[in-house]
A protein has these predicted regions:
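Acidic helix N-cap motif at the loop->helix transition within catalytic regions
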Residues: 63-69
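N-terminal glycine-rich phosphate-binding loop and ensuing alpha1 helix
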Residues: 2-61
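Short pre-catalytic strand/loop immediately N-terminal to key active-site residues, enriched for Gly-Thr
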Residues: 76-79, 154-159
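Short aromatic/basic micro-patch
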Residues: 31, 111, 151, 165, ...
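Residues at the starts of beta-strands that form the adenosine-phosphate
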Residues: 7, 52-54, 101, 128-129, ...
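Short, conserved active-site loop motifs that form the nucleotide-linked donor/cofactor pocket
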Residues: 8, 74-76
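Conserved beta-loop-beta/alpha segment of the NTase-like Rossmann-fold superfamily
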Residues: 76, 84-144, 161, 166
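Conserved alpha/beta core of the MobA/IspD/sugar-nucleotide pyrophosphorylase nucleotidyltransferase superfamily
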Residues: 2-6, 158-227
Length: 227
């Protein structure tokens, strides 16, 4: 294994308001096992020697709260954008270390493992841009207006997760191209931006533990993992 220490930065988009969760505070600030959701993945990245720095993009109205609640020498908190990809762009532009690569991870995936993060780092160095994804286990249907159109071979389907990773220089170049010629769609992750511009994106196998916290039902399931 190569020496990965200090070669990577992390950007953690935490700007969503989690409307599907309900409540009056962002879901990333809700307590999970007595600790705010965002702290789980944030602390995992901060603990890793591979990480040179971590930037977290948060809602503008909550920036002071985050800064008062948690600080770390490797952590910088910035204001997120209107869309997730713009929050990531703000985070990437705020990086100041000598790191070559960036891993983007949703704080709503609190149980990402250090093993998966290291697998992403290794894949990024040996192959190129990559994302974590888990293989589909259910039969996948394409439907329109409530009517099934066709069935997809699930062996070719992967459910995207995070981290998603690329070189910092590459992402900055692509953000520059978007500024010059805006996209005709709203990307929901970094991989879709890379794909749009013809970049190869490799898969790192994920797992159920790395699923995203989205609904109140998810919250109950995730809370049971902290007991």
């Amino acid at each position: 294994m190569q020496n990965l220490n200090g070669r990577f930065a992390a950007v953690l988009p935490a700007g969503g308001l989690g409307k599907r969760m309900g409540g009056n505070i962002p879901k990333q600030l809700m307590l999970l096992g007595g600790k705010p959701v965002y702290r789980y993945s944030l602390e995992t990245f901060l603990e890793m020697e591979e990480s040179a720095e971590v930037v977290m993009a948060v809602p503008a109205d909550w920036k002071d709260h985050f800064e008062k609640e948690f600080s770390h020498p490797k952590l910088k908190i910035v204001i997120g954008g209107a869309e997730r990809w713009q929050s990531v762009e703000n985070g990437v532009n705020a990086l100041t270390s000598s790191a070559e690569f960036v891993l983007v991870h949703d704080v709503a995936r609190p149980f990402v493992s250090k093993e998966i993060i290291r697998d992403v780092c290794e894949t990024l160095i040996t192959k190129g841009s990559c994302l974590v994804a888990k293989p589909a286990v259910d039969t996948i249907k394409i439907a329109a207006d409530g009517k099934v159109q066709k069935t997809i071979d699930r062996n070719t389907v992967w459910m995207a997760q995070t981290p998603q990773a690329a070189s910092i220089a590459l992402l900055k170049k692509l953000y520059g191209r978007i500024a010059a010629e805006p996209l005709n769609f709203t990307p929901t992750d970094e991989a879709s931006i890379l794909e749009y511009f013809g970049e190869n994106v490799y898969i790192v196998k994920g797992n159920v533990a790395n699923d995203k916290l989205t609904t109140p039902e998810d919250f109950e399931i995730f809370a049971s993992r902290t007991r």
